[in-house]
């Protein structure tokens, strides 16, 4: 027996130990993009390195319960390597390392992968994953099997003991402040404490932990203190203004980068406005990524630092939990509340989150028209001017509009497509031609975003209602910058300004945090504030117990007993609508659709015929007529699809803003329900927009629509059946119905 135990320790356990050390060196090399830096980390932080190894060692010991141990070693090692390689790739695009929350973003990431990788790179990644999967399957089949008794009970005891040892090491290291579980800066934490610990911590550290002094008495004491905080005197009089917040993607003043030179100022409008208006630096919670956390802090006044490492509350709690925000507060004051974003509405789960934050409407890209795109296929911000003005005129009440832009988003290309895009701003100074080109691309996006700022303020100057406009950058772009590279010495700082179309705001210069800006604006306008805003108004960072009390407030509202609301939690999800304009069907007609001619293919065919090659090619490339049905209505766009049998029909063809075509060989039956829905790139829909009942095909089979036809349906408003109405209200079994019935 002793000999067997000896062999057990000298073989399997030793293999786990060696593998753990080798894996951690590889993971640190990948994370630091340098073997030398990884070795330096091991040399300078030996205890932290061994602690990280102990975590890997524990995961490897799970293979000791398997008869195919080599297979177990390889699978667990492969899992760690996948995480490390992913972190390596992510750090090539942004400053923030890969964490567990990014895995919740996988669906969103797939929709934008083409903006970060070329087609051949995507194919290569897919091929490598396929080869790896095939290798795992082959390894499982071919790997040797341990024969005899593997002593499961003793092995289990050993694994459990290893787990508790790791937990003990963690507690000792935390108490000794060798490591920390409070990551103010995720990149710095990964650099100081190692990839394995930081990533593992992001898996288990989610939400806000209960503060040690949290109690009903404490929260009621805080409530009583904040109830005494009243409103401030308005700086603009009694006529309450429309309030517009615009969050500018990756927006900064590039002149702060010490080594860059420009052919001209990329952002003259922003420069002028920040000099003339209340403005300052705005400390954001992230660098190069994390848009959702920036808007979370701005909208709520909450400090995201109290949440888990790298956590996005939008993805973990706000999809199922209401929260007080600027929107909920302004609704109490009679405002209509609107959100808009010129990118996918499902990104960061905004389509779920915004209804829990008090918004009446949400207009994502799927409900916008005349979108233009950058070279990297991000939506340009020029569309937002019209959307904001449309929203302002849509309601009779005052409006709160929260806008999130996207044009400045990375990745920034090292080659410019000057044949199809204009790049008037020239940038130099990095000492690297490819990097100069990336900065040139980025600064030209800033220039176009600045033109949007100028166009919007000009339109608002002519608007007949008072408007207060707040603009700010959500975070710095994902370039490899250090604090020493920028004039202000802080990579977490962007800038903001507060402007009024009535020129009736005071001019103040103040540097604040993102979670303070809503309070600052509300104080300027004399608005009634939420509890968090009252706290931010009365206390400032650095005051005694500031962090402790703010953390208690955030915990009480989101995870605690809500002691601050003894009469009950007042916030319910809104019955949020998507878009401002009604998308509707007027009638459906049977017809024939001829797709537009592919000019490129036609030219190629003509060249082939001229060269006396296979002339059949030209015939084959002629567009073939399609039989089916025309769906007529209003406010369609490229995201509008026919919806039938609880699913959208991907074959729907967008013809123009009032016409869709559905290729279909089978005839619709008289009385059949036909619906339309808006569907995003990720195939998630936003619910049924409108439904009609088909009146039947024309009696004369020759009466088919080509350009003009005759109406042959019953309008929804005239004769939609009770069954159809109930179907829209109850929704379908798909994600669309889930969204339309969440309220």
Please describe what each predicted stretch is.
Residues 2-190:
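Transmembrane and membrane-interface helices of multi-pass
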Residues 94, 102-115, 122-123, 200-208, ...:
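Short alpha-helical interface patches
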Residues 103-106, 192-196, 216-219, 267, ...:
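Alpha-helix initiation and N-capping motif
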Residues 230-237, 248, 253-743:
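Solvent-exposed soluble domains appended to multi-pass membrane proteins
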Residues 109, 243-248:
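Residue-level preference for non-acidic, small/hydrophobic
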Residues 44, 48, 52, 68, ...:
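Short, charged/polar micro-motifs that form catalytic or ligand-binding hotspots
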Residues 170-245:
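Membrane-interface segments at or immediately adjacent to transmembrane helices
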